[in-house]
Structures are given as C-alpha cells and as structure tokens.
Amino acid sequence: MSKVIGIDLGTTNSCVAVMEGGDPVVIANSEGARTTPSVVSFQANGERLVGQVAKRQSITNPDKTIISIKREMGTNHKVNIDGKQYTPQEISAMVLQKIKADAEAYLGETVTQAVITVPAYFNDSQRQATKDAGKIAGLEVLRIINEPTAAALAYGMDKMDTNQKIFVYDLGGGTFDVSILELGDGVFEVKATNGDTHLGGDDFDKKIIDYIADTFKADNGIDLKNDKMALQRLKEAAEKAKIELSSSTQTNINLPFITADATGPKHIDMSLTRAKFNELTQDLVDRTIEPMKKALNDAGLTINDINKVILVGGSTRIPAVQEAVKSFTGKEPSKGVNPDECVAMGAAIQAGVLTGDVKDVLLLDVTPLTLGIETLGGVATPLIERNTTIPTKKSQVFSTAADGQTSVEIHVVQGERQMAADNKTLGRFTLSGIAPAPRGVPQIEVTFDIDANGIVNVSAKDKGTGKEANITITASTNLSDDEIDKAVKEAEKFEEQDKKRKESIEIKNNADQVVYQTEKTLKDLGDKVSSEDKKAIEEKVEAVKKVKDGDDLEAIKKATEDLTQTFYGISSKIYSQNAEPGADGGANSGANPGGTTGNTDTKDDNVVDAEYKVDDDK
C-alpha cells in the first residue's frame, strides 16, 4: 500500500510529512528546504514556477506572481494571467502538485492520497475548496483536519497518561485560530474553537511595508506603493526584518536603487527596532485576545483549567505574540516542536491513524459555525450549533406555511445571526411532490449530516409521501474574504437588533396563525355558533388583521389576545350547551379548536410552523 502524506497547506509556506518507523518525518523539497513557499509564478515563455524559485523572481515579475492565495479559498476570487482566469483552488493545486512531486521523489513511489489541514475556523465552502484543490492536484484527500488538532498530535500529547486540557494558539501567515482540546486515553476532543481567517504574518509584514513607504514618501515625496517592483522589494525586506526582529532588538533595512527621480537614484537605508515594530503591530496582537476569551468561554473553562499551551505557526516566533499568550494564559508556552512543521507532522500522524499504522488515537473535531435553515418569517432555525463534535447527524421536523403547498425550498445557512439573510448561504434546494394539505399538516424532516471533514450534506423528506431531496454543500465561491470571522462579530454587534426582529416575527406569525385557526374552526362549527357570537368573533378577527402587518407589537399582541379570549368564551358556551346532563361540564377541559397562542395548547405551531423533534446520531 502506498504511503499517505500529511500536508499543511499554508498561506505563506506549506509543509509535508510522512510516517516512517512509527514517527512523523518532514520531507525536504527539491531545493533542500523543509518548507515550501505557497507562491506560484508565470513566466513570459509560459513556464510555471512554484515554491522558492517563484518567490525569488517575484521582484522582477510581480504582476504574474501569486502569493497568499489561501486567503481567497472558498470565494469567487479569480486570478487573471495573460487573459486566463484561475480560481484559488487551481492555484493551490499547483502548490500541492509541487509538494506531491517532492514527496514522491523522497519516497520513490507514487503518492495518491493525503490528509490536508485547514484553519479550525474555515467554513464549509473553504474546506470544500481545499478538498477540490487536492483533487485537482491528483490527490485523494482522505481527511480534512483542523490545524490546532494536528499540532497537538505532533507535540506527542496522545502519549500522556493523564487527562489534559490544551490551549492551542495558531498564528500563521494569513489565518489565526485558537482551540481548546481535551486529551485523554488517546482521544483528542476539540471543546471549542474561535479565530480570524484574515489575520496573520502577512498583516505584520504590511505594517512594516507601510512604515517604510510612508517614511520614504515623507523624506522624498515619492510613493513607492505605486511602483509594483519597488513594492515587491519592500515586501521581501519587511518579511526579512520581521524575522530578524524575533532574535534581535534592531535590524537594518537596506534597499539601494529602490527608485529614481530627476535628481538621480534613491536608496533606502534605515533601522527598525523591535520596540517600533511592536508599536506598529500592537493592534494585530490585540486582535488575538478576544478569540482566546471566546474559545475559553465556549468551552466552559477558565484559564486555570488549562494544563498546557501550544504555539503553532511561524508568526508565533514574534516576541510580542509570545508575551501576549503568556500574559493571557499565565503559562510558558511549549516549544518542543518547530511551529512551521508541527501541523504537517500531525497530519501525517492522522494519515497513519487512517491507514492503521497508528493505533489508539481518536480525533474528535468540531464545526466552527452554527448550521440551520430559513423558516417562516426569514428566521434562521439552527439544527447544529457551533462547536458541535463532528461527525454528527441531526434531524428536525418542519411543515408547510400555506394551505395546499406542494413544494418547499430549503435554504441552508451557516452563521450566528438570528435572521437567515444575515448569515452565509451555503445552498438551496427544493422538495417537490408534497401532497396538498392544510398548512401545518405535512411533516417534512430536514436532516443535516456533517462528515469528519466538516463538509455538509442536507436532505429533506416528506414523511407522508416519502418524497426526498438532498444537497451536498460544495464550494459556492461567493464568499468575501472576511465573511467567516464577521459572522460572530456581527452576531454580537446586532444581537439586540436581531432579538427585536425575531420577536416581531414571532408575534406576527402567532397573530396570523390565530386568525387562520379561528376562521377555520368557525367554518367547521357552522350553525352551532349564533349569528351574534359569529359577528363578535369576526369583528375581533378584523381587528387583528388591521394591525398584524404593522409595527406596533403591543397592539398586535392585544388584538390577538382579545380574539383568543373571545373565542375561548364562545367555545366554552358551545361545549356547555352540548354537554350531557350530569356531566362535569368540560367547558374548560376539552378541545380548543382555535387554541393557537402557544400558551395553553402544547400542540400549537411556533415560528417554524410545526412541532419538531431532534434526533442526534453522532
């Protein structure tokens, strides 16, 4: 059986490892380096360069050099090279092809299968895009796993005898994640995850670039940001300065002949201290604090519950980052494994688990964002809450919103907002062939199934006719770059507004339902209701209809309650008249054909217009 490789497909650098003799081994690339820049370049003669050679010539060929494409995964972003458009998946596949070739050269055999890691906070579209990139590169992706989980594996946490709670801080080239894992008896269970898919080492580089460019402009009146070749040289110098400041308190930035004007050539020769670098990047470090707090809170833990802290990603070499983590956790982070290599090593261990080479290890990851569907009134009804352990499967029964409805559209959303329109649309599909019936009668079972890769399948089944429809959520390619981390931030910002909107919809839905049930029951009772009582009810019905589409919620509630009480009174009178002599009356114990307020009849419809039950199958 051929080897299964573990790949850390990074924003700035990628790494590959394989299990040998029971241990993960990092595979060096054809240039002899243990990591490969995630850079692709196209030459004038049509040749394509990948990795270090592509990065080296980026200064002279900035227009046709693609960097940090991982930030665009799962979006509709396209790269235009000589009139041909490339998707992020295609560019990533070029990096994977290079990694695959290097692994094959090392192993001396063809490689067809891999485990690839992604940031824990990647959404469904981004995960699917990563899997597609592997397929394009000729790799069967056996599993997509979260980077922090892979890192914990690489640190040998599975060999611990006692239960441990691990705090994983992962700051890479373009993404940031923090995860809380509970480990014991070879089981790795992710308790919570949080992060920012648009924060990483690239942002630290940009701060230095801006500082150099602004200083140069102030001194010389020339904006280097308008010169692509000069800007590429600034990027290289900024990255080099950042790395040097991790071990030195000061570095020199020397860029001769950066540009020229009428007075002659211009040069950059300046110093950058670690103190100044820390000042420039303080806001970036601060952005990592809130996700740490949220992850702890979601896990139901305090910092005192944490046994060990792990740093992952090259950007964690920055002293200010290390200090921030130490200050927050009160613990010295573990530094036993190279932060650039540990994720690939963990992926290789997981590959070993899947092939049976590694025994007694079980990974239990979580889904980063809530999954649900749109229900009556545009409400997002959750089926699987964020931080639910995967793989998982959950079902819930819904119904129709109109009489005689023969089809329903299932709108699948992902996010933390209470209204469907404010969340990320993952897909839509239609279930047809529902037998015509009064609204609320058909039973439509919607099932969400998330596999171990975090990829979603959704199905809907009419329990009456047996008709079924389903969708596998694939990369929708319409994500904006910051959409995933905006989901939770917006949920907090608009939480109060969301609550009010949801309350408004629930009140209006209830009013509409009370009117519907009252008119239906009135029609069913026919002559049993006196003309005087019928007129009283119809007046109350009209009163509700007049206000139910307005914005005065108190007026809607009052009119609905008035109608309900009037109907109760008349219902009681009818049952009293029909009761047999000697019976106990039953006026207040019997059926309430129009009871729909949700306060007195447990069978009433709520905002999703149906009863439901939840079946968990993990």
Swiss-Prot record:
<dbReference type="Pfam" id="PF00012">
    <property type="entry name" value="HSP70"/>
</dbReference>
<dbReference type="InterPro" id="IPR029047">
    <property type="entry name" value="HSP70_peptide-bd_sf"/>
</dbReference>
<dbReference type="GO" id="GO:0005524">
    <property type="term" value="F:ATP binding"/>
</dbReference>
<keyword id="KW-0143">Chaperone</keyword>
<comment type="similarity">
    <text>Belongs to the heat shock protein 70 family.</text>
</comment>
<dbReference type="InterPro" id="IPR013126">
    <property type="entry name" value="Hsp_70_fam"/>
</dbReference>
<protein>
    <recommendedName>
        <fullName>Chaperone protein DnaK</fullName>
    </recommendedName>
</protein>
<keyword id="KW-0067">ATP-binding</keyword>
<comment type="function">
    <text>Acts as a chaperone.</text>
</comment>
<dbReference type="GO" id="GO:0140662">
    <property type="term" value="F:ATP-dependent protein folding chaperone"/>
</dbReference>
<feature type="compositionally biased region" description="Gly residues">
    <location>
        <begin position="583"/>
        <end position="597"/>
    </location>
</feature>
<dbReference type="InterPro" id="IPR029048">
    <property type="entry name" value="HSP70_C_sf"/>
</dbReference>
<dbReference type="InterPro" id="IPR018181">
    <property type="entry name" value="Heat_shock_70_CS"/>
</dbReference>
<dbReference type="GO" id="GO:0051082">
    <property type="term" value="F:unfolded protein binding"/>
</dbReference>
<dbReference type="InterPro" id="IPR012725">
    <property type="entry name" value="Chaperone_DnaK"/>
</dbReference>
<feature type="modified residue" description="Phosphothreonine; by autocatalysis">
    <location>
        <position position="175"/>
    </location>
</feature>
<keyword id="KW-0597">Phosphoprotein</keyword>
<dbReference type="InterPro" id="IPR043129">
    <property type="entry name" value="ATPase_NBD"/>
</dbReference>
<keyword id="KW-0547">Nucleotide-binding</keyword>
<keyword id="KW-0346">Stress response</keyword>
<feature type="compositionally biased region" description="Basic and acidic residues">
    <location>
        <begin position="601"/>
        <end position="618"/>
    </location>
</feature>
<feature type="region of interest" description="Disordered">
    <location>
        <begin position="576"/>
        <end position="618"/>
    </location>
</feature>
